[in-house]
Amino acid sequence: MATTILKNEGLDFHIKISTPLSEIDNDIQKELVDLTKKVKIAGFRAGKVPIAIVEKKYGASVRNDIIEKRINDSVNHVIKEHNLNIIGRPKIDDLQNEPNKPLEFTIKMELLPKIDIPDLKKISINRPKLEVSPDDVEEQLKKLAEMMKSYTKESKAKAKDGDQITMDAVGYVKDEAFEGGKLTDFKVVIGSNALIPGFEKQLIGSKAGSEVEVNVTFPENYHAKDLAGKDARFVVQVKAVHTAEPTVIDDEFAKKFQSNSLEELRTHFTKKIENESEEAISTIMKMNLFDQLEKLLDFDVPESLLDQEKNILKSETDKSEQDDSVFKDKSPEQVKEYYDKLALRRVRIGLMLAEYAKDKNLQVEPDDLRRIIMQQARSFPGQENMLFDFYKNNPRAVEQLKGPALEEKAVQHIFDNAVNLKEKKYNRKELEKLLESEEQRITAM
């Protein structure tokens, strides 16, 4: 076998392989001889089939098998001889495979770059710390109490904000009743904003048994396109007005939520608020780490990985329909520049984190996969069991989580052992403002 390096530049390695016809013929003859001892052909005793008969029957398939083996062996030989760290599958080009001629082909391989992990001790990351105040907890308790309100006390007085109205209504557009505009025994709490903007406010002052005319304009983004942006008139028959029975926030209230006391419920809400903030805080810290890594990393990346990442980004953008918000008033060239820059950032950081995980001997454990699945489940409230069943019945889908799980593990290891963390305390409103500004910054990247 003769080899000629055609290209060894950057991350591209191309090499031409030439194998003499004599070597191919020898391999084929050896395989045919072996077959004469194994095959059974009518009219011949086992092991006594003439090689010419075997060659006529199996020659073409034997030759194909030998060629395929030679190609695979050549690829493995080249990788080992030149100590190549390749990505993806080698590509075989310019295959010359005619009978009675030498076997020639070109192996084209894309190499992984040499990655030097930067000095992570030079990186400082702010770690926001939420301080949950008693007022934060009381606000949550009041919201819960509001949800638990009961409207059992019927009122003969005029309806006011916070009262529940039971009504029949018919809606008209240009004096013509429209489909879906009829309500029967419909209940709404004034001020809940459950109906079209302005509807509930016009019910204030009404009484049981009265008729009210409500004039509204459907929002431009209303789900029924034929009504969007149109003026409408509703004739409302107020059937009953109920005032809310006050909910007392005490130990008995707490017991409705599997807590033994009000104090225990307060502790539960404190932890809940802290936990809800942790995921957002982790995202901020991760993006800040990636921002600094982007400035430190400067190595070539494989074109195949870049193209793959661009396709993933485009798919994600199409699904989330962010094109209008992110790329509004942007030219096609600016959109392409955005994708190119973000894809390069993602690939470089992903390769560096993979190298870091390898260097620190980090492995994906079952708990890491469960954590990733639980994170996904929180995005689908009410459908958690469906998601769990999906992964339970799809081992390949679980396998695809190993990459993200290892990246998360590497990031956490960096936070725990490598970079400098500076904790800064925030109250809830300050943290919400920080999260909002960071989300806007990330979206605009």
Curated annotation (Swiss-Prot):
Pfam families: FKBP_C (PF00254), Trigger_C (PF05698), Trigger_N (PF05697). The keyword Iron-sulfur does not apply. Its EC number is 5.2.1.8. GO terms for molecular function: peptidyl-prolyl cis-trans isomerase activity; protein folding chaperone; ribosome binding. It catalyses: [protein]-peptidylproline (omega=180) = [protein]-peptidylproline (omega=0). HAMAP family: Trigger_factor_Tig (MF_00303). The keyword Cell division applies. GO terms for biological process: 'de novo' cotranslational protein folding; cell division; chaperone-mediated protein folding; protein transport; protein unfolding. One of its GO terms (cellular component) is cytoplasm. InterPro entries: PPIase_dom_sf (IPR046357), PPIase_FKBP_dom (IPR001179), Trig_fac (IPR005215), Trigger_fac_C (IPR008880), Trigger_fac_C_sf (IPR037041), Trigger_fac_ribosome-bd_bac (IPR008881), Trigger_fac_ribosome-bd_sf (IPR036611), Trigger_fact/SurA_dom_sf (IPR027304). Involved in protein export. Acts as a chaperone by maintaining the newly synthesized protein in an open conformation. Functions as a peptidyl-prolyl cis-trans isomerase. This is Trigger factor. Its main location: cytoplasm. Gene3D superfamilies: 3.10.50.40, Trigger factor ribosome-binding domain (3.30.70.1050), Trigger factor, C-terminal domain (1.10.3120.10). Keywords: Cell cycle, Cell division, Chaperone, Cytoplasm, Isomerase, Rotamase. Residues 162-247 form the PPIase FKBP-type domain. Belongs to the FKBP-type PPIase family. Tig subfamily. It is found in: Cytoplasm. It is an enzyme of class 5 (isomerase). It comes from the Bacteria. Consists of 3 domains; the N-terminus binds the ribosome, the middle domain has PPIase activity, while the C-terminus has intrinsic chaperone activity on its own.
